[in-house]
């Protein structure tokens, strides 16, 4: 179906259908519960359902203590499989994801599903650090009767430390690179090589790369860049 609703309205639909429950856990409690050993198929680091079985009295006690609840999905589902352009098929158990934060704001996973559907987004290209969220979003789309987009999760650019490339690594903007003698054309060539669109040392222009682009041939491992030298490490 086409989506013309706001994320909070779609969250209310799931709530009215009995597919949610209030969660009073603090972030610290969630971290501790997620890191503790537990039975069942819940993946490491996922919310283990601490507040799922609270009685009305227990909920009232938490409300009286001044704990505003978040709203969580009661995700009674087995592994959810998604098909990614680069990663292929992969599956994960969906945990009880937050739909509405305890300040009343729709949470990311619900918001991105509803907003993308409302805007007619049918292709999503993003960093592979978000791949683990995709089964959650696929399950939410299915519950809401919304179409799943096509996903393509691309590897990140990392700094020499192996962490995600960031401003703290320095020389990540064109002016900073230009000050090191790295031209815009040099940047284009470095990027082309990293995407397997050109060979090292091959002179290329942007127009040359259009016909070479093929999503399924893109690399699936991170690319490490030394921003101080403007050179690719891997």
What are the residue ranges of the model-derived segments?
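Conserved catalytic-core subdomain
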Residues: 161-234
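Residues within well-ordered alpha helices
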Residues: 2, 13-14, 140, 176, ...
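Residue-level detector of family-conserved "landmark" positions at structurally sensitive sites
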Residues: 24-25, 151, 187, 202
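Nucleotidyltransferase catalytic core that binds NTPs
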Residues: 1-41, 125
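Active-site cores that bind ATP or allylic diphosphates and position pyrophosphate for catalysis
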Residues: 28-167, 173-178, 223-234
């Amino acid at each position: 179906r086409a989506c013309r609703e706001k994320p909070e309205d779609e969250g209310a639909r799931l709530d009215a259908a009995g597919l949610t429950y209030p969660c009073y856990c603090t972030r610290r409690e969630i971290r501790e519960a997620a890191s503790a050993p537990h039975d069942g198929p819940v993946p490491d680091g996922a919310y283990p359902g601490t507040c799922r079985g609270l009685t009305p009295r227990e909920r009232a006690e938490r409300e009286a203590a001044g704990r505003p609840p978040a709203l969580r999905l009661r995700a009674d589902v087995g592994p959810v499989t998604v098909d990614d352009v680069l990663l292929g098929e992969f599956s994960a158990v969906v945990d009880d994801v937050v739909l509405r934060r305890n300040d009343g704001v729709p949470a990311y996973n619900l918001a991105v599903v509803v907003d993308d559907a409302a805007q007619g987004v049918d292709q999503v290209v993003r960093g592979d650090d978000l791949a683990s969220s995709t089964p959650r979003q696929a399950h939410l789309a299915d519950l809401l009767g919304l179409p799943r987009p096509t996903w393509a999760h691309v590897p990140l650019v990392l700094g020499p430390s192996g962490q995600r490339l960031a401003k703290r690594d320095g020389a990540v903007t064109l002016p900073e690179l230009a000050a090191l003698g790295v031209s815009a054309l040099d940047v284009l060539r470095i990027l082309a090589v990293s995407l397997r669109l050109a060979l090292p040392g091959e002179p290329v222009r942007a127009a040359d790369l259009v016909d070479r682009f093929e999503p399924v041939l893109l690399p699936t491992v991170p690319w490490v860049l030394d921003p101080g030298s403007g050179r690719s490490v891997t």
